[in-house]
Design a protein with these regions (language model features):
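N-terminal organellar transit peptides
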Residues: 1-144
Length: 146
């Protein structure tokens, strides 16, 4: 199932108004047959990650071999949480948990919620992570983000 179909067929955990706002952004393109524009809209990453260290300026990839010891993984959840982004979140948590140079994880959150697919697994990964995981709320933390 492609991402456009998922928008209309998945279950959501977000305010109805936020869902309608999302749909109102893509419906004009769908009605005009401009599916490439809609797909491009959903290609934007809403979950990203990097590692940082208090003693050094800069950011590293989570799996960078030059990452300083005792670094912290920062996983950013910005905007609507789509199911494919939840799977990316799970990948980042697994990478951070497996990296001996990463001491803990910060979830930097600002979003209205999103699709519920994969949230149960992501929640389990967070609660069972062998490293400390904390959340920093940088705005909204609603529904699926919570």
């Amino acid at each position: 199932m492609n991402r456009i179909q998922l928008i209309f067929n998945e279950k959501w955990a977000m305010a109805r108004e936020d869902y309608y706002n999302l749909v109102s952004l893509i419906l004009p393109s769908i009605h005009s047959g401009n599916f490439k524009e809609v797909e491009a809209f959903f290609e934007k990453d809403t979950v990203t990650a990097y590692a940082s260290d208090l003693n050094f300026v800069g950011r590293w990839n989570l799996e960078d071999s030059g990452l300083p010891s005792d670094s912290v993984a920062v996983i950013v959840l910005e905007g609507t949480l789509y199911s494919w982004e939840t799977f990316r979140l799970q990948e980042y948590i697994a990478q951070a948990a497996a990296n001996d140079r990463i001491a803990g994880i910060i979830l930097w959150i600002n979003g209205p919620g999103g699709m519920i697919t994969g949230l149960d697994n992501a929640s389990k990964m967070i609660s069972e992570c062998p490293k400390p995981v904390v959340a920093y709320i940088a705005g909204a933390c609603a529904s699926a983000h919570f």
